[in-house]
Amino acid sequence: AGKLRLDKSKNDHMRLTFHDSCNVARASRMGNMPGGQFEIPRAILRASCNHYFDMDPETIREGTLCCGGGGGLLTDELMDIRTKGAAPRMKALREVADVHGVTHMAAICAICKAQFSKVLPKFGFDMEAIVSVHQMVSNAIVLTGSTQEEEWNKKAGLAAQAAGAQV
């Protein structure tokens, strides 16, 4: 009790990276350790999926790149500016997609999610490629007392049997 049970395989259709949102990266903390705002979302994502890859280290954490939609720019009339603002992040996303086959990018910030859903197609990505951290957890969570839990327990038992047979 008190722990979430996650089935990472529920997100196997995604190869994921994470966008450090400006406001979270520069103006907040998470947890009780320095840098928690960078490490906690990544730990949650790694616990929720089997295929996680960081973007270029120079473009994440304290060095994160803007989504291009913050600061009051999130309006369709300013789409040209928003697209130019998103270009550096889209370049970093393209690189991790080319190297690791990344198909989705998670973000915490609702502004970033709204921005990316509009600009991703302009850079050759599906607009559905932006997801949230809580969406990844929601996909993977195994609810207690559900048929999903029964399936999970069955899988876990089969995996344990297979591991025992290999020893």
Regions found by a protein language model. Give the residues of each.
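Iron-sulfur cluster-binding electron-transfer modules in prokaryotic oxidoreductases
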Residues: 1-167
